Amino acid sequence: MHQRLATLAAARLYLCTDARRERGDLAEFADAALAGGVDVIQLRDKGSPGEQRFGPLEARDELAACEILADAARRHGALFAVNDRADIARAAGADVLHLGQGDLPLDVARAFVGPDVLLGLSSHDRDQMTAAAAGPADYFCVGPCWPTPTKPGRAAPGLALVRAAAELRTGKPWFAIGGIDAQRLPEVLDAGARRVVVVRAITAADDPAAAARRLSSALAAAR
């Protein structure tokens, strides 16, 4: 747990990726992204091109994809995260379980995954953010900063919520999330964030390692 917390504290770039079933290159992609500077890598297949083409990811296939990402994360000294599924997180030996507001309560998730798995929580307004900062989650995310196809129909609180998070001056790690890419990153940094979650900025890149490196370098320069 202590090593995971230390790795989390130093983390700046958090990537959510789908299982890339339509491409069949998950292992190669993960290695490239992690080599480029991704600190945390999470599997999130909801709404992905693979889901649209092949249907929802079955639990057995999700576990197999998790094992690929977990192995890559270990080799690169990064953290591997599972989205929503406490059972998959436990089975895959995940470092992190990330939960949304409508997922398992944190105390229930903690009882299921044990004391060594880090817990993260999404927040989408000031009340949720303040509660997340004060609560038992090991880190929290704030956003979306911009509307994103990853969360269709969800209103984006925008950079105002990022500014509010920065004003909390909490010692707990937090990440800005939602529609962030290399072009928008300066705005996010100006709002006070020093950690970000990205999706398409790396998953849609022709060169994932280069895309990750560009983001990681900008985050490092802003410390």
Swiss-Prot record:
Mg(2+) binds at residues 84, 103. Its EC number is 2.5.1.3. Keywords: Magnesium, Metal-binding, Thiamine biosynthesis, Transferase. It catalyses: 2-[(2R,5Z)-2-carboxy-4-methylthiazol-5(2H)-ylidene]ethyl phosphate + 4-amino-2-methyl-5-(diphosphooxymethyl)pyrimidine + 2 H(+) = thiamine phosphate + CO2 + diphosphate; 2-(2-carboxy-4-methylthiazol-5-yl)ethyl phosphate + 4-amino-2-methyl-5-(diphosphooxymethyl)pyrimidine + 2 H(+) = thiamine phosphate + CO2 + diphosphate; 4-methyl-5-(2-phosphooxyethyl)-thiazole + 4-amino-2-methyl-5-(diphosphooxymethyl)pyrimidine + H(+) = thiamine phosphate + diphosphate. Binds 1 Mg(2+) ion per subunit. It comes from the Bacteria. InterPro entries: Aldolase_TIM, ThiamineP_synth_sf, ThiamineP_synth_TenI, TMP_synthase. GO terms for cellular component: cytoplasm. GO terms for molecular function: magnesium ion binding; thiamine-phosphate diphosphorylase activity. Its cofactor is Mg(2+). Pathway: Cofactor biosynthesis; thiamine diphosphate biosynthesis; thiamine phosphate from 4-amino-2-methyl-5-diphosphomethylpyrimidine and 4-methyl-5-(2-phosphoethyl)-thiazole: step 1/1. One of its GO terms (biological process) is thiamine diphosphate biosynthetic process. It is an enzyme of class 2 (transferase). 2-[(2R,5Z)-2-carboxy-4-methylthiazol-5(2H)-ylidene]ethyl phosphate binds at residues 148-150, 179. 4-amino-2-methyl-5-(diphosphooxymethyl)pyrimidine binds at residues 42-46, 83, 122, 151. Belongs to the thiamine-phosphate synthase family. Condenses 4-methyl-5-(beta-hydroxyethyl)thiazole monophosphate (THZ-P) and 2-methyl-4-amino-5-hydroxymethyl pyrimidine pyrophosphate (HMP-PP) to form thiamine monophosphate (TMP). NCBIfam families: thiE. This is Thiamine-phosphate synthase. The lineage of its organism: Bacteria, Bacillati, Actinomycetota, Actinomycetes, Mycobacteriales.
